[in-house]
Amino acid sequence: MNEINKIWQKILEIILEKVGESTFELWFSPIKLLDIKNSEAFIEVPNRFFKDWIEDNFPSIISDSFYQITGSQVEVKYIITGKEHETGLIEEKKQVIKKGNLNPKYTFDTFVVGPSNQFAHAASFRVAENPGFAYNPLFIYGGVGLGKTHLITAIGNYILDKKPEMNVCYISSEQFTGEFVSAIRHEKMPEFRNKYRTVDVFLVDDIQFIAGKDSTQEEFFHTFNELYSKQKQIVISSDRPPMEISDITDRLRSRFGMGLIADIQPPEIETRLAILYKKADMEGVKLPEDVAYFIASRVKSNVRELEGSLIKLCAYTSLTKVPISMDVAKYVLRDLLPDENKPITIELIQKAVCEAVGLKIQDIKSKKRTKEISNARKLAMYITKKLTNLSLAEIGNAFGGKDHATVIYACKQVEKEKEKDESISRLIDSIIKKVTGQ
């Protein structure tokens, strides 16, 4: 195995850990690293739908993983299999992204407005028209894949379009933390502070990830104050409102609520249909009405999954040269779309938990008491109690003959862990959504 392949295998391992097995197998397993030249990584994708989906859903995951493995920043450039001559066009598009580190696809024009996101959209547009004066800070919160990143990026793109001289910075809180730690390690704090305290617009995605990181919170607090005092626009996104973010300081939580707080809810069916038609139009695909309704009626809570279902369907029909139809949609999306009539059983919950943590069902049914197995067993018991009407004795019996007291203890332990560790809450939420088909 040559050096490039070794690097790529390590990167794939990181991506697998971040996105989960099903997403990895579908979207990342088929792509490969062709070459690395002059800080540019050339990635081969089967067709443009893969490129579009990765850029829309995980725009920085490959470059971030490169940095984690090699310590070097790279610019990712996509090459479509068999179409090397299109590389220049793709590279040209990628150059636009460099400005403010913004994805040019995320604009107000491409954002579908509905009752579930109307307020957040209106607030974002107002901020974009009058940065630093309308609502400062603007705090947008909502579940995973509902359009928070799209909106805060649209703010940046709009401002740069109208006022290209402005210094717009988009960054995730994880990236902010990583650069902060690196600056301390390499004694480059003055450069770090100059980079983030001199911007005109500060767009921060997924702020909840600084929870529990005291030094990062301290640095972010002073960065926030410096920008706010100069009337520079601050926009923050999170998966929950400020008051529900645990393990952050009260003074930081207070800063988050100083301006306007806007939420995004899961889209209703009309908005989901509009999103599908908009995405299909952007991809140059004719989407039959029955297929659109089929997808929209099944994928209910997540715009990212909604668009992902369409992109998977488009990728399949593009590769196989067959037209989009209801039969094709049902076949291609059979694993992604839930069966609404499927009852929630303890076996279904055990399977979902084990898939999420990488164990076998027989492990959590066994007498084994390793920490990994014990934690998974407690999670499964907790979710079973939450989603079913089974008695405590019935739940215990399904986990290797445990008694009702063990189930009660397990549920209490999970509740405590949820309060201390937000990653546990996110894991439980994702498992519940998978089991319930949301």
UniProtKB/Swiss-Prot annotation:
Region entry Domain III, AAA+ region, spans: 101-317
Ranges where the record places region Domain IV, binds dsDNA: 318-438
InterPro entries: AAA+_ATPase, Chromosome_initiator_DnaA, Chromosome_initiator_DnaA-like, Chromosome_initiator_DnaA_CS, DnaA_C, DnaA_dom, DnaA_N_dom, DnaA_N_sf
Record region (Domain II): 74-100
Keywords, in A-Z order: ATP-binding, Cytoplasm, DNA replication, DNA-binding, Lipid-binding, Nucleotide-binding
Single Gene Ontology MF annotation: ATP binding
Pfam hit, one: DnaA_N
One Gene Ontology CC term in the entry: cytoplasm
Location(s), subcellular: Cytoplasm
Chain positions recorded as ATP binding sites: 145, 147-149
Chain spans, region Domain I, interacts with DnaA modulators: 1-74
Domain of life: Bacteria
Gene Ontology biological process terms in this record: DNA replication; DNA replication initiation; regulation of DNA replication
UniProt note: domains: Domain I is involved in oligomerization and binding regulators, domain II is flexibile and of varying length in different bacteria, domain III forms the AAA+ region, while domain IV binds dsDNA.
Homology family: Belongs to the DnaA family.
Assembly mode: Oligomerizes as a right-handed, spiral filament on DNA at oriC.
Summary of the function given for this chain in its UniProt record: Plays an essential role in the initiation and regulation of chromosomal replication. ATP-DnaA binds to the origin of replication (oriC) to initiate formation of the DNA replication initiation complex once per cell cycle. Binds the DnaA box (a 9 base pair repeat at the origin) and separates the double-stranded (ds)DNA. Forms a right-handed helical filament on oriC DNA; dsDNA binds to the exterior of the filament while single-stranded (ss)DNA is stabiized in the filament's interior.
Protein name: Chromosomal replication initiator protein DnaA
